[in-house]
């Protein structure tokens, strides 16, 4: 009886919402990312590298102003942050073992990443074009009834990568509202393989929260955590986050 009731509820919810994947694609295709936007983008990073049983930690944060309009992408750094990066470089000349998280953060503010954060509908459509829908179920999330879509992502791999891999998994979960607008996503990847008799493992989880601003789907919160292990070199784990604010 309980099982039948659960199936009935699921069928009613599915009937009410319609085809989630079709709604998602239709909504994304209507977002043409043309309206000018200015955003504050804050990046935070932390990492732990273990080599010869010795752990090295590094962390940092930086904030920039990003303009995205018909002229392209413009990224504005503050003079204080430029000075911080220069100071870090000077200290690195005196001690090459010092971590340099600020330079890495500055490099993360590239046009490709900023475009993905402020005009994400195109990125998501490309991912969907190489993905297979596995399931669609209703789910309550933060007090809102959403549709949960699970995908297997089949991104193309080079012949060399295929030969070196033992296993590879890439799964994407999307939560969309009644109109097909993405609310959040989570992508998990796991890879195991070997090359030249050296084994390696890597895994990552990327979480995104979305917000519609005009004709844009922006990523208001992006959080990535990853870990890598190479049999003869040690391990590395890192987390990074972008927080996007639009006035």
Locations of regions flagged by a protein language model:
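Hydrophobic h-region of N-terminal signal peptides that target proteins for export
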Residues: 10-18
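Sec-dependent signal peptide recognition
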Residues: 1-10
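Structured extracytoplasmic
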Residues: 19-169, 191-195, 238-247
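Absolute protein N-terminus
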Residues: 1, 18-19
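Gly/Pro-enriched, hydrophobic low-complexity segments
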Residues: 147-247
């Amino acid at each position: 009886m309980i099982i039948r009731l659960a199936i009935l509820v699921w069928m009613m919810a599915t009937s009410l919402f319609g085809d989630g994947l079709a709604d998602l694609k239709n909504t994304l295709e209507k977002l043409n990312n043309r309206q000018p936007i200015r955003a504050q983008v804050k990046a935070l990073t932390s990492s732990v590298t273990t080599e010869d049983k010795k752990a090295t930690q590094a962390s940092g944060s930086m904030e920039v102003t990003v303009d995205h309009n018909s002229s392209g992408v413009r990224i504005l750094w503050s003079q204080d942050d430029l000075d911080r990066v220069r100071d870090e470089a000077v200290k690195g000349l005196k001690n090459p073992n010092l971590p340099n998280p600020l330079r890495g953060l500055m490099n993360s503010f590239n046009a490709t990443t900023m475009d993905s954060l402020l005009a994400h509908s195109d990125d998501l459509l490309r991912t969907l074009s190489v993905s297979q829908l596995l399931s669609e179920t209703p789910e309550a999330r933060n007090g809102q009834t959403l549709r949960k879509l699970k995908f297997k992502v089949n991104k193309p791999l080079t012949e060399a990568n295929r030969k070196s891999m033992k296993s590879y998994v890439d799964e994407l979960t999307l939560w969309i509202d009644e109109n097909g607008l993405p609310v959040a996503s989570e992508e998990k990847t796991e890879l195991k393989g070997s090359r030249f008799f050296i084994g390696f493992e890597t895994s990552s989880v990327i979480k995104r929260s979305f917000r519609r601003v005009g004709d844009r789907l922006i990523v208001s919160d992006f959080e990535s955590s990853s870990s890598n292990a190479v049999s003869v070199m040690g391990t590395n784990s890192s987390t990074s986050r972008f927080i996007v604010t639009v006035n």
